[in-house]
Amino acid sequence: MFIRTKVFRNKDGSTRTYLQLVTSERVGDKVRQRVVANLGRLDELQAGSLDRLIEHMIRFSRRQWLLEKARQIEARQARTWGPVLIFRRLWEELGLKATFARLLNGTAIETDFEEAAFAMVLNRLLDPMSKLRVGEWVKTIYRPEWERLELNHFYRALDFLAEHKARLEEALYARVWDLFNLKLDLVLWDTTTTYFEGRAAEGFADYGFSKDKRPDRVQIMIGVLVSRDGFPIAHEVFPGNTAELDTFRHVVEKVKHQFRLGRVILVADRGMVSEKLLEEIEEAGLEYIVGVRMRKLKAAREVLSRPGRYRKVASNLWVKEVIYGGVRYIVCFNPEEKEHDCQIRKQAVARLKEKLAAGEVKQLIGNSAYRRYLKINGSQVGIDEHVLQEEAMYDGKYVLRTNSSLRPEEVAEAYKSLWQVEHAFRELKSGLDLRPIYHWTEKRIRGHVMVCFLALVLEMALRRKIKDLGEEVRYDDLLLDLCQLKAVDLRVDGSHYLARTELTGCAEVAFRAVGVRPPLHVTEMPRT
């Protein structure tokens, strides 16, 4: 088809020109032109309507072109891409790739072992599961280097991690100290236990004091050593029946000889350390900081009632020192938490009054959340005002006990670091899914824990880099947004392209934090 002009002569000798859309058709052995459409007078079309007509036709034409092209596009698969880009950068920046190469002496298995280890670590961070399924999980992630991995690579990588744990930790320690300027004037130590659902390594997993409250299961004990600003330095795995003091003595020697650090302080949460253990720690000349269970210890009430001025450490942390019974206590106060605790109690009391008025006494007595505020005198049940006044004394406060010479604010900050250690253990056992443990040989168990430890190091490295940017984003949200960045395998007219989806949410923060540019929207892949 084409456009032609058709000129008509008027009676007065003037002319008028029309535009026509014409097609050529063969009729017999001749070619004839057939008018498909009369578009109008040329002078009127040139006044502006011609441009509008052309624009409309181009839009219609482009849509048709795109529809035709779309029929030629084959989107074969979309795989998760964002997290592997971020954590691979951190993996290499922390020197793990180079350390693997050095330990394996450049052998042919170097890349497979290193990639298998990285895959398991990323799996712990994103989608924890048994190693028996990690071989399937890697197929959902875009990393071409993983296409050649087989199940035996993962198991052999676990063995490698167990065998070379000490050297990997030493290399990491040196690199992390340099990258993040860690405060290493003191380091903190805490332990946890984790029990077994699967078969256990005989003589390694054993019955012992269970912090998971599962004395019916064999377990192992895990300790993590962290800097005072919460960065993981090393970890140890002990048989399940190891005494806590023995783990502490072990780590003190480790710190002195392996890392050349002078001071280790045992930091423990409320209820996790017995009075007997504290006495043994002091007799051994070691230091501790432990939380006090305020409502279960008479000394805590005495300490809270002692006069003294609080010293401001931060907007949400005030501290004061109290010596009672020859023991040093640090009272910590958070004004924001005080308001929160007070509000929660007021709401509980309001509901309590409603239920008392409705005669729901039996329900209240059986509910521990309400029963603590009740005063029962024979058949008479009412609100215990004395208990309410006593509860107000605890609002926004917690008490620490220590035998260290640290300043009160340093004690409080060190205990806050414990939260990060405890968070690390929660990550190990839940988010990083240390339990249930299915690897039943001692070497595989140790390798599994090492995978979790490396995942924790990568997570803390990313958190630290984001903090250094001055950005405030929730880590879980960041991971979700990174997982939305997909690599899409496209085939167009026989050509191969790799396309990516758009960055969403706070994913771009992660790329800025680690200094990596997001991939191009579309990349033409080499022909194979």
PLM features: residue spans?
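Accessory, often N-terminal, substrate/partner-engagement and coupling regions
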Residues: 51-112
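Anion-binding and metal-coordination hotspots
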Residues: 2-5, 11-13, 17-20, 28-32, ...
